[in-house]
Amino acid sequence: VAFYFSDGDGGEERITYAELQRASRRIAGEMLRRGLVGHRALLMFPPGLEFVKAFYGCLYAGVVAVPAFTPRRNRNVQRLQAISDDAEASVALTVADVRDRAVGMLDETPTLQTLDWLAVDELVGDPGDSDAMPTMRPDQLAVLQYTSGSTGSPKGVMLSHGNIMYNVMAIVYSFESTQTGLGITWLPTYHDMGLVGGVLKPLYFGRPNVLMSPMVFLQKPVRWLRAITKYRATVSGGPNFAYDLCTQKITDEEMEGLDLRSWQVAFNGAEPIRAATLADFCQRFASVGFREEAFFPCYGMAE
């Protein structure tokens, strides 16, 4: 198994490496058929495995991936248009449900209207011919990663194939002690920590990863720690606020059944790290096997 997608309450989907390769190449083949090599693709997916298939489909096809969020009828549609305009996107990759719901919102966003919308879950047929896939160089653009835009318009950062490989290699080197383990992330894949740590690093590492929706964690933080317990995860983490949320929201009753002894790397980054947060989390969860030395403060693309 390459990736799991957990609903946080016991349900899961899974995809093997072979299935992921076939699905990604099928998407790549369709983009090659449409002549999209070198173009920018806006990726707008709900949490799940379809994003992973589409993202690797872009890498196969030599299409620049632009991870983004799904459109909603509020300010976020305007932010999507700003990203699409800046990236000069020509195609939108998504699933049929999101595409159909987006139709009524596009009147205010002429740029999004002109995109070639491709629902990857409707594609059928054989995977694309591997001989037709372009050969990529390390210096070629792979991803346009956009900032959150919390202080203004989102800004795109150009990440080459070489940039990404070097970053992933550095993470793997740092997490060397967890080579036999499995990871879990609830972080959104359109942010760099969720994309690199949750989608790219696991495949390079050759270890499975469990994906969860951010809302699954935010609505009930104990689901994160229950997933670590269930899957015996060795690597998982998030921004500082996630550890505060666990300490503050998880009740004594919810603590029952947790077992965090497998957790070897609890990374913490993407925002300021507070010593009090680490101390409080350790004190709260030591009784269920969390070890202080598991904490791994880090910084990456966001910083």
Regions from the PLM with identified roles:
Residues 48-71, 82-91, 181-182, 200-210, ...:
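A short helix-loop-beta submotif of the ANL/AMP-binding
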Residues 77, 85, 97, 105-119, ...:
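Conserved adenylate-forming
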Residues 1-15, 142-144, 151, 300:
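AMP-dependent adenylate-forming
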Residues 45-49, 63-83, 96-98, 207-228:
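ATP-dependent adenylate-forming carboxylate-activation enzymes
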Residues 117-118, 122, 126-146, 152-153, ...:
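Conserved pre-ATP/AMP-binding loop-to-beta segment of ANL
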Residues 165-182, 189-234, 249-253:
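Conserved AMP-binding/adenylation subdomain of ANL enzymes
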Residues 3-56, 72-81, 133-135, 156-162:
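Conserved AMP-binding/adenylate-forming core of the ANL superfamily
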Residues 41, 58, 92, 141, ...:
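Conserved S/T- and glycine-rich ATP-binding loop of Class I adenylate-forming
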